[in-house]
Amino acid sequence: MQKIEKFLNQYPEKAFFLLLLLALPVFFINLGLLPLFADEPTRANVALEMIISKNYAVPTIGGEYYYNKPPLYNWLLAGLYLLTGNYSEFVTRLPAIVPMFLFAITIFYTVSYFIRDKRIAVLSGLLFLVNGRMLVYDSMLGHIDIFYSWLTFGSFMLIFYFFEKKQWFWLFFTSYFITALTFLCKGLPSVVFQGFTLIALLAYTGNLKKLFSWKHILSGIFCLMIIGAYFLNYYQYNPNLEGYLVTIWAQSSKRTATEFGILATALYMIKFPFEHAGHLFPASLLLLFCFHKSFIPGIKNDRFLKYIAIIFFANIWVYWLSPQTRPRYLLMLYPLLFLIWSHAYYTYRDKLPKTDKAFEWIILGLSILVTMAVPAALFFNLSLYVSLLELKVILIFAMCCVCTWLIYRFKTQKLLGFIGLLLTVRLAFSLFVLPHRAYHKIENYYKAAAIEMGYISKGKPFFFYQYHPGELEIPFHDRLIFYIERTRMEQVKFTEDKVKPGYYFTFDRDLQDPGARLIRTYQDLKFYEVK
């Protein structure tokens, strides 16, 4: 036991990468088990249609222009599809999961460089993987946000790196280059992050005049040239740039206070910090160590921590004032909190002995409760869809026991033992919860229906008839489109007409045509053939 703790104390970098290596199977097991859901099918559709149409400049869904997001992430996903020759859920999620690990590594190295305390770097990087939000939700979805946030966080770090060296050209050039890339991922939020970060840093340090320097202006022009080159190429295929830009603006502004009113916004602002502390649990337990009288002076006296605090508050208010902000929009800001919390933990835990003791009892108590709960998996009929259930339960129980014992016995590394337990919880989630969801989810029924329709209609036109979904229904319909197109490797089309020969899919109506033959009914969805 002492040898393990001695290793963790002497070689924090090796400990970090060892835990990262152990985390690989934890997050990758059963990654492709669930059908696509939420925003995943939208990203997958755009990438797939680029491949089918051989047009990578113009995002489309169902052959119609898709304006909500620029295409950089879709290019990455399409590249993976082509590289692997595979259009599975597993491959669809790789552009999110691989950057998640790269993000953790980036946090580790940047914190190691700027703070020179690898304990803080290890904890900050690992907390990105094991906070509640990432542990059981974002880490299993092929969303754009982890990749986007990784690039944005990298820009934050490069800005400070070049600021410290007073290399103004490289500060502006590299951050604007990343802004161009992130704009081509997600649109206007990238401009907001770049603008607020630069203005806050330069205003606080008395360097606002640098905004008018040739170095800043040239870098900004370079950014606009990259973005402009994309839109110029896009214009060759679709001259409706106004519709594209208006939609990108609407996507960025639709969740703001102007849409929801003063009362709803006020209530949201009150619950915002508590809600996100919940999303980040158990990492947010480290807030306990921020209640030391030296906490704020400690931030002010450290140039890097002060910068982190400045850019956090410079950017967070936009989301604090925007009802219905989704936690994944803040993934580039969460590591700033993990960094500050980790610094507080290692700096003030010896000065707050009662708090430290309470914290240790909390994580030990949570570990014991989790360990005792593991055998309950044997009583939920999981054997219907989990092979070797008893063996897997024994494995998870043993791993939880080992981690709990380490937490109990360690003197200085209890938190790393707890992180080991959290990774074990995620492994249990992958082994038990994901198969349970896959077995019971209605999405499997519709996935099978879409694949069946794809096989039946192969080689012939396929139309979605009078397709006018509400916003909340779009992910459901996009999922159907993806599985149909993946099976056919041809685009579906949207139509208001019912006289063309081919196959028709209707959502809320019959196909009133003498030549229409009803082939299948999938609950309230109908599949017709018109000859």
Give the positions of each predicted feature:
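Short acidic/glycine- and proline-prone juxtamembrane loop motifs at membrane-interface regions
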Residues: 139-147
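Membrane-embedded architecture of ER/inner-membrane glycosylation machinery
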Residues: 173, 293-485, 493, 508-512, ...
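Membrane-interface alpha helices of multi-pass inner-membrane proteins
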Residues: 170-186, 315-320
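Membrane-interface transmembrane helices that cradle and orient dolichyl/undecaprenyl
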Residues: 113-115, 155-171, 345-348
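Transmembrane-helix signature of polytopic, membrane-embedded enzymes
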Residues: 13-17, 107-130
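Transmembrane-lumen/periplasm boundary regions of multi-pass, lipid-linked membrane glycan transferases
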Residues: 190-302, 311-327, 336-339, 356-364, ...
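Extracytosolic helix-loop segments that constitute the early lumenal/periplasmic catalytic or substrate-binding loops
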Residues: 24-28, 42-68, 72-75, 254, ...
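Transmembrane-helix motifs of polytopic, lipid-linked glycan transferases
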Residues: 94-115, 154
